[in-house]
């Protein structure tokens, strides 16, 4: 078969399209017992994916594809995050370029701009994920701001609010004056910065408010906040200030009226208080207390019932409480206040310091601690905190009660024939010497069976797959006494079959059970079978039994050290500020009653009919106004859905929101009729029509209004909360929200908890912890079993990738240049647990060469495969030792890869298949086969001709057999090239390699003796090749060599594989000698001394001289580099990449020098 050159772009486009069109990765109704579910960490709709996203998606896809090939029903849910602050920030920057701001546009128009941006970003990300080759189920795609998720968010908020776990309070928050919103503690990034510590003198006053001439000096880094001071605090154990506690001080500069948060006037004469939280060794030991602008001061202010005076507003400017400094920027005010203090001789001194300053994680603005009214989740409450710690620290127990049936068959010296309804029409005859008990399936009459014919490898593989598939089922067979089993086919006795029993997932040999107590054996499968009794009748009595299974559920962090990282944070948990003063996001579902002050939380639970629920959700989502026309509703519901444009918004409501198909008419006329009936008082007199009085009609505006009423006083005078929820609030619901919560859906029952979460360490607190909190609270179960925490992707010098530095590597550029398979394999092989990835573009180029190697190996196999290859297989010659060696290595590689992936050892798994394919299969086995592949058969000798053809067929059979399985092992890492090549193989069956079985180690294919022989052969050939290279003998030049050995094993290997040694080491001869011949250079290979004859090939003296010159040059260069790296000035001032480059040069020089010295030692010998 002809196979053209490798073209990554062509095959990637072809197979991406194929996978999506075939919906290969969609499982309509997954089986809970076989499922493997994963939810993608939803990328933000803020732009395109970076290399960190590519790594995350690759690591997930490797595991998902591997699990799918192991027989699991994999459901990997894709989706996107609306990313409140981040997305709003991106759109605001775009508006700024046009000279506009969101405040000028207003909320409604600004949100329209965001909705114009979001589809562009989402489509770009979806395209990138598709190019990367991820095997997600696009039919289940979700968005954190879609109708179903928005409904789930409102439900979660209401539930927590009614449970007293959401509250609204005055609190000190991290305020970003640029984004004008509160930030959680996790959204603040701290940086060490140079600053000043100002020492300010506060005059002490007497009981009449007159200065006493005494001062108390306080130290502060933020003099601008002193205008809001309401106390001075000292430690009660500080002897320096005990005499001042209880007295008052005059606040410097302030000679104007100040008001607290409730509008009460606050004096400029402030108390001196004692509090143990004051550090005696900071500054002077006396500190100013500004409860409205400092977290510790806030706590101290609450303890001592101090007034809260705000002096900085939401924009970072001084407010009316700042008097003479009002209107100034906070930093401008700082300078002015310091100057005034200096002028009034109240500034004692100024010290330069380095301190930690908090910045907004998004825009890098210095945050302003500020008291404001915010919404919080009480995550410190034991109802949330305790279980979130327990599921990670010790796990939780889950009990499940199952009902089974026991069928007790009383038989004695009796044969039972079990006809199997399988292809082949075989029967199993069970000859029972004693009573047998069958403990069988879920319903009466369902008998478990075990069977595979001897010698049929395909059925053996099928049986093993069944064993894996059913090992966790509640099917068991208990035998008392030892049955004898034979296989009947076509009513004639044939050779007794082999049989496979599985116990605890392990293969058992039935013969070894003799004399032991009865075993409970888990069967390979299930099936209905009639019992055909050949001698006597038997009585089977079904009996129901109940079995209670208890299993532990625990969230496991990988690597394990992240468990401590998580728990340390959880034990010191603070309540979570969830309100954000922005416009893009989930608007808090709270309506304040202007008449009675009641706080109302509305969800669609407040409505009965599907129409009303939908209209409420459209209003709450901002898709229509509270006043609307029926035409507006119809237009929205009939428009294509944002996430799934193949369906309408109404279809999305039916499938993803309510999960049932209401038969509803949503035309404008039908809605108008519905509203009219609802508001008509006469409707009460109409049989079958109920009145709800939900809608009102405004004849002037010609619009209908959905009426919301206060749940306390019934007033319609309500105002909705303007803040939106923190993005992470909706993201915390992701693992169960995507499966339809709060509805009790089949997906939710079958796919939750999910099996794996792959994420970066930087969002363990932001996201992972909160998913655990919300999952355990709402679902009463863990959200996922395994959390794999991957490291950061850095540049080759270990620096974080940054546009500022200019070291960002775009995954799309890499795919364009080297292909998605090269990108994926590079990221996987570099992923070592607990170690950051240092990424250089040459790495991708290297693994593109690997893809080429795979392609060319397949070309070699296919181009040498005749059209009648399959027909020739029955006549092939027995396997040679090199055939058995490569099959053994294949099985060992399969075992190593499986074990590595079970433990998320990506690098180890990738290295194993890389070494096998590149070295064992390509560099060695293909070379071994060339003698048989290209050997010409004599035309005049039919017997010899048949022998040559049959040996060629054996080589081709082994090449195909190993290639097909190796492609399957490679597939999770390199899906495109493996899919393309697999379909070209004659022994590949099925619509996709991704649905083929992942190879397992087969003990029957381990040929240890042949493996040892071929490994010894490789060592001998490698030793000869190495010395040839050192002697600089041309690869095409044939030379003589000889050997001496005391090892009988090595002697036999050389004799058996003499032709391979001559061909692959390019030798004229290789004979055994008793002593070293003259004019030879010696090398060793374990127990064998090898002599290469150099006469006529090498000028030894000249070669030694050449290597000595090379050694001298290396020593000089190494001396230069060492001198540079020992220079402290160079190490401090040179850029990181320059220092790293010099270190790499040093390492390379040392390796080269070592090699040259080893060669010289050999040559001089």
UniProtKB/Swiss-Prot annotation:
One of its GO terms (biological process) is valyl-tRNA aminoacylation. A motif ('KMSKS' region) lies at residues 800-804. InterPro entries: aa-tRNA-synth_I_CS, aa-tRNA-synth_Ia, Anticodon_Ia_Val, M/V/L/I-tRNA-synth_anticd-bd, Rossmann-like_a/b/a_fold, tRNA-bd_arm, tRNAsynth_Ia_anticodon-bd, Val-tRNA_synth_C_sf. CDD domains: Anticodon_Ia_Val, ValRS_core. It comes from the Bacteria. GO terms for molecular function: aminoacyl-tRNA deacylase activity; ATP binding; valine-tRNA ligase activity. It is found in: Cytoplasm. Transmembrane segments: none annotated. Its main location: cytoplasm. Keywords: Aminoacyl-tRNA synthetase, ATP-binding, Coiled coil, Cytoplasm, Ligase, Nucleotide-binding, Protein biosynthesis. Gene3D superfamilies: HUPs, Isoleucyl-tRNA Synthetase, Domain 1, Valyl-tRNA synthetase, C-terminal domain, Valyl/Leucyl/Isoleucyl-tRNA synthetase, editing domain. Its EC number is 6.1.1.9. SUPFAM superfamilies: Anticodon-binding domain of a subclass of class I aminoacyl-tRNA synthetases, Nucleotidylyl transferase, tRNA-binding arm, ValRS/IleRS/LeuRS editing domain. A motif ('HIGH' region) lies at residues 43-53. Pfam families: Anticodon_1, tRNA-synt_1, Val_tRNA-synt_C. Belongs to the class-I aminoacyl-tRNA synthetase family. ValS type 1 subfamily. ValRS has two distinct active sites: one for aminoacylation and one for editing. The misactivated threonine is translocated from the active site to the editing site. The C-terminal coiled-coil domain is crucial for aminoacylation activity. Catalyzes the attachment of valine to tRNA(Val). As ValRS can inadvertently accommodate and process structurally similar amino acids such as threonine, to avoid such errors, it has a 'posttransfer' editing activity that hydrolyzes mischarged Thr-tRNA(Val) in a tRNA-dependent manner. This is Valine--tRNA ligase. It comes from Aquifex aeolicus (strain VF5). The lineage of its organism: Bacteria, Pseudomonadati, Aquificota, Aquificia, Aquificales. The gene is valS.
């Amino acid at each position: 078969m002809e196979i053209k050159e490798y073209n990554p772009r062509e095959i990637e486009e072809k197979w991406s399209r194929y996978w999506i069109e075939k919906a290969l990765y969609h499982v309509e109704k997954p089986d809970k017992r076989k499922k493997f579910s994963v939810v993608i960490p939803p990328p933000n709709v803020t732009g395109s994916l970076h290399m960190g996203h590519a790594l995350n998606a690759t690591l997930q896809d490797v595991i998902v594809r591997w699990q799918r090939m192991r027989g699991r029903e994999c459901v990997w849910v894709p989706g996107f995050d609306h990313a409140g602050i981040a997305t709003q920030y991106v759109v605001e920057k775009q508006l700024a370029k046009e000279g506009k701001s969101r405040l000028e546009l207003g909320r409604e128009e600004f949100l329209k701009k965001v909705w114009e941006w979001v589809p562009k970003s989402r489509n770009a990300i979806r395209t990138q994920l598709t190019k990367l080759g991820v095997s997600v189920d696009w039919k289940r795609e979700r968005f954190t701001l879609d109708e179903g998720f928005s409904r789930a968010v409102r439900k979660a908020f209401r539930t927590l609010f009614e449970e007293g776990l959401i509250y609204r309070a005055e609190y000190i928050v991290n305020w970003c004056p640029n984004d004008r919103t509160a930030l959680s503690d996790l959204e603040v990034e701290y940086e060490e910065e140079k600053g000043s510590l100002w020492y300010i003198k506060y005059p002490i006053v007497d009981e009449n408010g007159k200065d006493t001439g005494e001062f108390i000096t306080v130290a502060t880094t933020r003099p601008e906040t002193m205008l809001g001071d309401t106390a001075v605090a000292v430690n009660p154990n500080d002897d320096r200030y005990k005499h001042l506690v209880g007295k008052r001080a005059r606040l410097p500069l302030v000679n104007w009226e100040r008001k607290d948060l409730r509008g009460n006037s606050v004096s400029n004469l402030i108390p001196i208080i004692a509090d143990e939280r004051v550090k005696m060794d900071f500054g002077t030991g006396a500190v100013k207390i500004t409860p409205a602008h400092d977290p510790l001061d806030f706590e101290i202010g609450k303890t001592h019932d101090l007034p809260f005076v705000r002096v900085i507003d939401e924009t970072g400017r001084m407010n009316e409480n700042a008097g003479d400094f009002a209107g100034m920027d906070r930093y401008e005010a700082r300078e002015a206040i310091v100057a005034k203090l200096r002028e009034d001789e109240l500034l004692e001194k100024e010290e330069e310091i380095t301190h930690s300053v908090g910045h907004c994680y998004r825009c890098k603005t210095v945050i302003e601690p500020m008291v404001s009214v915010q919404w919080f989740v009480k995550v410190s409450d034991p109802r949330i905190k305790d279980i979130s710690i327990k599921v990670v620290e010790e796990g939780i127990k889950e009990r499940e009660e199952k009902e089974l049936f026991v069928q007790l068959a009383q038989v004695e010296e009796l044969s039972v024939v079990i006809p199997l309804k399988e292809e082949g029409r075989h029967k199993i005859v069970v000859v029972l010497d004693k009573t047998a008990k069958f403990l069988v399936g879920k319903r009466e009459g369902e008998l478990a069976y075990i069977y595979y014919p001897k010698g049929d490898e395909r059925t053996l593989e099928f049986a093993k797959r069944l064993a894996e598939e059913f090992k966790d089922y509640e099917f068991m067979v208990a035998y008392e006494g030892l049955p004898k089993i034979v296989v009947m086919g076509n009513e004639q006795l044939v050779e007794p079959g082999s049989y496979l029993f599985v116990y605890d997932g392990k293969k058992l040999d039935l013969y070894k059970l003799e004399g032991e107590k009865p075993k409970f054996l888990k069967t390979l499968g299930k099936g209905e079978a009639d019992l055909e009794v050949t001698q006597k009748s038997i009585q089977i009595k079904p009996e129901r039994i109940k079995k209670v299974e208890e299993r532990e559920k625990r969230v496991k962090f990988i690597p394990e050290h992240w468990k401590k990282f998580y728990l340390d944070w959880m034990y010191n948990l603070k309540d979570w500020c969830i309100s954000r003063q922005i416009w893009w996001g989930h608007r808090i579902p709270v309506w304040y009653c202007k008449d009675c002050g009641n706080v109302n939380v509305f969800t669609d639970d407040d409505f009965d009919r599907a129409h009303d629920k939908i209209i409420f959700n459209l209003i709450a989502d901002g898709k229509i106004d509270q006043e609307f026309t029926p035409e507006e509703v119809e237009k929205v519901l009939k428009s294509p859905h944002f996430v799934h444009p193949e369906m309408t918004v109404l279809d999305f409501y039916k499938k993803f929101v309510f999960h049932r198909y209401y038969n509803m008419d949503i035309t404008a006329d039908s809605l108008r009729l519905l509203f009219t009936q609802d508001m008509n008082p006469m409707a009460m007199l109409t049989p079958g029509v109920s009145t709800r009085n939900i809608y009102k009609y405004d004849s002037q505006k010609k619009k209908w209004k959905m009426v919301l009423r206060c749940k306390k006083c019934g007033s319609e005078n309500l105002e909705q909360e303007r803040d939106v929820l923190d993005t992470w609030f909706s993201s915390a619901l992701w693992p169960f929200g995507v499966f339809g919560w709060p509805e009790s859906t089949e997906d939710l029952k079958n796919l939750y908890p999910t099996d794996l979460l792959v994420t970066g360490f930087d969002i363990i607190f932001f996201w992972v912890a909160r998913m655990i909190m919300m999952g355990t609270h709402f679902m009463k179960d863990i959200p996922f079993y395994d959390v794999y925490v991957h490291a950061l992707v850095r540049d080759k010098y270990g620096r974080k990738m940054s546009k500022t530095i200019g070291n960002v590597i775009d995954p799309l550029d890499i795919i364009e240049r080297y292909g998605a398979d090269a990108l994926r394999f590079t990221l996987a092989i570099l992923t070592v647990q607990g170690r950051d990835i240092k990424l250089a573009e040459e790495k991708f180029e290297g693994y593109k060469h690997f893809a080429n190697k795979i392609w060319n190996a397949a070309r070699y196999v296919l181009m040498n495969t005749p059209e009648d290859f399959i027909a020739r297989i029955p006549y092939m010659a027995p396997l040679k030792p090199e055939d058995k060696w490569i099959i053994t290595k294949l099985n060992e590689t399969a075992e190593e890869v499986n074990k590595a992936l079970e433990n998320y050892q990506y690098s180890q798994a990738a290295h194993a298949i890389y070494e096998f394919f590149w070295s064992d299969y390509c560099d060695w086995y293909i070379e071994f086969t060339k003698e048989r592949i290209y050997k010409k058969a004599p035309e005049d000798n039919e017997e010899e001709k048949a022998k040559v053809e049959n040996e060629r067929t054996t080589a081709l059979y082994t090449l195909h057999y190993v290639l097909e399985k190796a492609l399957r092992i490679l597939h999770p890492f390199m899906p495109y090239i493996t899919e393309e090549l697999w379909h070209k193989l004659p022994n590949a069956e099925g619509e996709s390699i991704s649905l083929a079985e992942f190879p397992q180690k087969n003990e029957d294919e381990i040929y240890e003796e042949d493996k040892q022989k071929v490994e010894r052969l490789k060592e001998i050939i490698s030793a000869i090749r190495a010395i040839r290279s050192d002697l600089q003998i041309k690869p095409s030049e044939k030379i003589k060599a000889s050997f001496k050995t005391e090892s009988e094993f090595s002697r036999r290997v050389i004799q058996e594989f003499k032709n391979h040694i001559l061909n692959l080491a390019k030798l004229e001869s290789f004979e055994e000698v008793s002593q070293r011949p003259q004019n030879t250079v010696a090398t060793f290979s374990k127990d064998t001394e090898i002599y290469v004859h150099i006469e006529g090939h090498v000028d030894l003296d000249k070669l030694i001289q050449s290597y000595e010159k090379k050694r001298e040059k290396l020593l000089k260069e190494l001396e230069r580099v060492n001198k540079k790296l020992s220079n402290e000035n160079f190490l401090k001032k040179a850029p990181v990449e320059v220092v790293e480059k010099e270190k790499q040069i040093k390492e390379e020089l040392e390796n080269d020098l070592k090699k040259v010295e080893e060669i010289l030692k050999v040559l001089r010998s």
